[in-house]
Amino acid sequence: MTLATSSANGAWEAVIGLETHVQLGTNSKIFTCASTTFGDDPNTHIDPVVCGLPGTLPVLNQMVLEYAVKAAMALNLNIAEHSKFDRKQYFYPDLPKNYQISQFDEPIAEEGWIEVEVAEKGKDTYLKRIGIERLHMEEDAGKLVHAGSDRLAGSTHSLVDYNRAGVALAEIVSKPDLRTGREAAEYASEIRRIMRYLGVSDGNMQEGSLRCDVNISVRQGADAPFGTKVEIKNMNSFSAIQKACEYEIQRQIKVYEAGEAVVQETRLWDEGKQLTKSMRSKEGSSDYRYFPDPDLGPIEVMASVREGWRDELPELPAAKRHRYAEEFGLSVYDARVLTDEYPMAEYFEAAVAAGAEAKGVANWIQGDLAAYVNANRISYSTLPFRPEQLAEMVQLIDGGKISGKIAKEILPELLEKGGSPEAIVDQRGLGMISDPAAITTIVEELLAVHPQEVEAFRGGKTKLQSFFVGQLMKKTGGKADPKLANQILSKKLKG
């Protein structure tokens, strides 16, 4: 839970803000042409600029600027007419230059918002607008590997891989508008969804393409001043974000109710133990001694360029969800699932455009197709079973040519190889039996070999009709028209 009640002073309220670091999916780093490929041998994607060697000068990757501006536009941020880069000074082994190029007082974008749908356990889903303070560009640091432990404490020694150093980041800073762990997780999920729709990042949390730091405090009542803020790191899933928030809220409440003070610090989420651990005291901005980077000029994006980039933005997830509900009559749940991944949404729309009924398409995509795609770790964009073929199969079912059972039988082959469902049905004689005379003959044969069941049915055990339906389907290989079969069975059983 995320709210606790103090017996003396009433309800506690959590105040949560997120700093989301999004790796921008450019082929080269933010200030140099070094590769950004993930997973290669350590320290194979570094160069003099990354290492800050004497005589080297950074040059801004224009694609980074474009991606950052598009991300800002999608988050309803105001794009700055003038921005600049600054040096953030601190000393740590993963920072080869002993400073990080970031943006301090003049970021590329400020003052935006997104709306998220929040489904709290035991409550109705609600829509919440979350303010976004800023988006700024910066370079990523390297990665430390601690031998013998997953953190510095307890390790025998540490290794550093600078392949990640210099990779472009867009840091998105929310306002402290979140109140529960669930809201924080939904906000982070929507940020990733938007970035993926834009194509500016793959948002893969396991590879560090999207990382979230949570700032959290508690206060007694919505009108009380903010409490002491604690930063939480090391959460590599949306579930971890929610659980870390929920744990930290309760920890801080217990500290206050014991008459003690919450320490301003950075803590790590321990997934194994399901708790947060103290890491270090929290620095303030003055500790970093920011100053403008003398090697990089100011950034000014012409209005015509900005509008050109705005015209390239796709329909975003929230707008697509709303349209699916309005245009296709889908439920809020169906619209949310279908728009979760851009390739899935495109697949759905292509199948509907091919003539199939939207709800039928939605059911197949969310069921059997989603299971296959997830199990095989592929995308809908590379699925052999193309959307127009799914549309054909749905139309065969709706038109009464095949049953859902037959569709499920031929689907594994279609998912593996693709092809025309109608052609497979015709070649194998799988078309539905919808001739009343043919079904009547089969029904009469079944009644003749099951006289006891017929007598029991006529004696009041009407549920036995499902037994006869099952026998009929077994005898016809599932090809009998279910509606027609039930009608004929009902008539014959009643005598």
Swiss-Prot record:
Catalytic activity: L-glutamyl-tRNA(Gln) + L-glutamine + ATP + H2O = L-glutaminyl-tRNA(Gln) + L-glutamate + ADP + phosphate + H(+); L-aspartyl-tRNA(Asn) + L-glutamine + ATP + H2O = L-asparaginyl-tRNA(Asn) + L-glutamate + ADP + phosphate + 2 H(+)
EC category name: ligase
Alphabetical keyword list: ATP-binding, Ligase, Nucleotide-binding, Protein biosynthesis
InterPro entries: Asn/Gln-tRNA_amidoTrfase_suB/E (IPR017959), Asn/Gln-tRNA_Trfase_suB/E_cat (IPR006075), Asn/Gln_amidotransferase (IPR018027), Asn/Gln_tRNA_amidoTrase-B-like (IPR003789), GatB (IPR004413), GatB_C_1 (IPR042114), GatB_Yqey_C_2 (IPR023168), Gln-tRNA_amidoTrfase_suB_CS (IPR017958)
One term of GO molecular function: asparaginyl-tRNA synthase (glutamine-hydrolyzing) activity
GO biological process, one term: translation
Entry annotated with the keyword Ligase: yes
Record note on quaternary structure: Heterotrimer of A, B and C subunits.
Family per similarity comment: Belongs to the GatB/GatE family. GatB subfamily.
Described function: Allows the formation of correctly charged Asn-tRNA(Asn) or Gln-tRNA(Gln) through the transamidation of misacylated Asp-tRNA(Asn) or Glu-tRNA(Gln) in organisms which lack either or both of asparaginyl-tRNA or glutaminyl-tRNA synthetases. The reaction takes place in the presence of glutamine and ATP through an activated phospho-Asp-tRNA(Asn) or phospho-Glu-tRNA(Gln).
Protein name: Aspartyl/glutamyl-tRNA(Asn/Gln) amidotransferase subunit B
Species assigned in the record: Prochlorococcus marinus (strain MIT 9313)
Gene name per UniProt: gatB
